[in-house]
Amino acid sequence: MSAKEKFTSLSPAEFFKRNPELAGFPNPARALYQTVRELIENSLDATDVHGILPNIKITIDLIDEARQIYKVNVVDNGIGIPPQEVPNAFGRVLYSSKYVNRQTRGMYGLGVKAAVLYSQMHQDKPIEIETSPANSKRIYTFKLKIDINKNEPIIVERGSVENTRGFHGTSVAISIPGDWPKAKSRIYEYIKRTYIITPYAEFIFKDPEGNVTYYPRLTNKIPKPPQEVKPHPYGVDREEIKILINNLKRDYTIKEFLVNEFQSIGDTTADKILELAGLKPNKKVKNLTEEEITRLVETFKKYEDFRSPSADSLSVIGEDLIELGLKKIFNPDFAASITRKPKAYQGHPFIVEAGVAFGGSIPVGEEPIVLRYANKIPLIYDEKSDVIWKVVEELDWKRYGIESDQYQMVVMVHLCSTKIPYKSAGKESIAEVEDIEKEIKNALMEVARKLKQYLSEKRKEQEAKKKLLAYLKYIPEVSRSLATFLASGNKELVSKYQNEISEGLFKLISKKLDLINIEEYRKVYRVDSE
């Protein structure tokens, strides 16, 4: 006789507490990295999205050597958090300000809460928050935990002090078990790669060993922030339609609903859609049956004349900032970038940007250095399972002038979208969506053509220099013959003319070879001859 099955439910907090690896917390090293990452991303979303030049300070301290507990503290100068929202923002899983139809670094309302859950599993210190919204006269402080069964914040302590220093922004400190020696290189790489695409930000990083690294602001130019937009009809399903209807504050007809609640639908398009769906324009939208909602969604999917989704919801890095960051960090001989035009997949707009840096101080390797970004987030882990890596690996770089298997090259790809198709909640690799993969390939080919042109011009220049260097060995003989002819047998004039002609020829070639002086030409000539 079989035992009875016991059925129960889990709160979101309990689920991710039981499955921390799904949120990017499988072990102490990854947990330390993921905590730093989540806090920095929150700080950037609180600054540049709102037109504030970011000043971000990151500190990691070892506070319990025996148990390897680290305290991660990130402070920003962002817009701050309304005090009434702080407990839920840090203590309720799947609660977020980022459930909007625009590009954001965060997506799930999970990140920092996953860090809090992991923290609670291994030690007893609460998360500490200090925040002050812009123009606030108070600085609000909180110490919080998460009630895992109820998925609710537990307020351990709260208070406020007078804001005498005009501070606005947020400070978050989390104590968490970590493995700094194993996480060190990843954390440094994450901050460096973040800095590459945010050269308008200032970062100060103090690690557990006491080392302080300063990343200075290189420009005051901030990319245009994304705007919240209405949903595109091609990207919605039945349940989203029902949510939109339930949230309506006006008693719309079906036609009014389509025109006012969706992008890419005007009066004419609405009439066509309703005719195809067999729905009456004047019927109240809240009276739609389940079957009618299904017909409407199916008509959306079949209709081929929608305008592409608006790109106002997206914020690109921009070609100037990409090249500025690549040049600052890698000091290459050549850097180029491209920002492609907006495209869409499944009704979600997206833009691909690509950059390449070549030569200079870039180390030589068997593979190019690949920098992957999604919504301005560096993707450090799971590189080989990402669609960006796949496209880079499959591209025939020899077509673009890379002739050997030794690469001295950095390849950068940024995908921004209202919905990044991540493979997991850890947000480290992008799935192989056909439309996105094709656009990444087009972007890389376009920027690779710029590299090919540079390499072609460089090779032509090198070949021309070789020819000019070959001419150097004939200068003594040519100058002597010309001097003898011009001097008409006068030995004193022969010597004088020969020196003048020789110097003149050296100077003529110097303009072509870009060497500093004649002695350098002669040195080059001697080395070349040897």
UniProtKB/Swiss-Prot annotation:
Keywords: ATP-binding, DNA-binding, Isomerase, Nucleotide-binding, Topoisomerase. It comes from the Archaea. One of its GO terms (biological process) is DNA topological change. InterPro entries: HATPase_C_sf (IPR036890), Ribosomal_Su5_D2-typ_SF (IPR020568), Ribosomal_uS13-like_H2TH (IPR010979), Ribsml_uS5_D2-typ_fold_subgr (IPR014721), TopoVI_B (IPR005734), TopoVI_B_transducer (IPR015320). SUPFAM superfamilies: ATPase domain of HSP90 chaperone/DNA topoisomerase II/histidine kinase, Ribosomal protein S5 domain 2-like, S13-like H2TH domain. CDD domains: HATPase_TopVIB-like, TopoIIB_Trans. It catalyses: ATP-dependent breakage, passage and rejoining of double-stranded DNA. One of its GO terms (molecular function) is DNA topoisomerase type II (double strand cut, ATP-hydrolyzing) activity. Its EC number is 5.6.2.2. ATP binds at N42, D76, S97, K98, G106, M107, Y108, G109, L110, G111, V112, K113, K427. Pfam families: HATPase_c, NFACT_N, Topo-VIb_trans. HAMAP family: Top6B. Homodimer. Heterotetramer of two Top6A and two Top6B chains. Belongs to the TOP6B family. PANTHER family: DNA TOPOISOMERASE 6 SUBUNIT B. Relaxes both positive and negative superturns and exhibits a strong decatenase activity. This is Type 2 DNA topoisomerase 6 subunit B. It comes from Saccharolobus islandicus (strain L.S.2.15 / Lassen #1). The lineage of its organism: Archaea, Thermoproteota, Thermoprotei, Sulfolobales, Sulfolobaceae. The gene is top6B.
